[in-house]
Amino acid sequence: MSFTVLIPARLASSRLPNKPLADINGVPMVVRVAQRALQSSALRTVVAADGTEIIEKCAAFGIQTVLTRVDHPSGSDRLAEACGLLGLLDDDIVVNVQGDEPLINPALIDAVARQLEARPDCAMSTAAHSIDELADFLNPNVVKVVLDARQTALYFSRAPIPAARDLAGQAWWKHGNLPKPLRHVGIYAYRVGFLRQFPQLPQAPLEQLESLEQLRALWHGYRIAVHITEHAPGPGVDTPEDLERVRRLVANDAHLADPV
């Protein structure tokens, strides 16, 4: 299996300014993400940065980078430019690891790439894990996904799906022998040819309604393969509180990667 990990990194962040460079026990966050990705089976790991400050910090730790434009409207556009700068071919596979996931499990990166490699009918792949708590199922910030028999995504939603007609608002999976609902995990693998096309596709009405970019792919008829992991990934960093939590985990030398 051959694939490249791309980590988009931009300094602008409304909730946490200069987030990629946030210090986590002496190491910039984006560097910690790259160090985790380097433990995967990826042929190479590259940070797609929007400024020289990120590139200089990464270089100090031996992390490969490419400099992308600052005016990209989405992370997908930045990744597509990075693929061109790296000379990747249309049939190559890239895994998009978010730059705010410093505890990403390297085995999960491999699993998502492997899932796409095994599904030539799919343009991209992602991951999901089971939901146990009703509060998570009902939380619109927890994105749910429903699959077909081959673990291909049918739909992603902020709504509680699938909905049990006779057990609305309840933890229906605790009644009888029913499979648990699935929470989407925000890691993606793409075939490079599709990634180059994706930013040019018109936004889908459902994408705009749910504010979920992956619905654009489904709307335009592309398939998304889904790897089901047994455990939730490590915490990401969106707020100062998240950052402090990750710092404590690293300082305490906690177990940083759940098994896939």
Swiss-Prot record:
GO CC terms in record: cytosol
One GO MF term: 3-deoxy-manno-octulosonate cytidylyltransferase activity
UniProt xrefs under Pfam families: CTP_transf_3 (PF02348)
Keywords: Cytoplasm, Lipopolysaccharide biosynthesis, Nucleotidyltransferase, Transferase
Residues in coiled coil: none
Keyword Cytoplasm: yes
Superkingdom: Bacteria
Principal location class: cytoplasm
HAMAP family xref list: KdsB (MF_00057)
Name of this chain's protein: 3-deoxy-manno-octulosonate cytidylyltransferase
Organism: Polaromonas naphthalenivorans (strain CJ2)
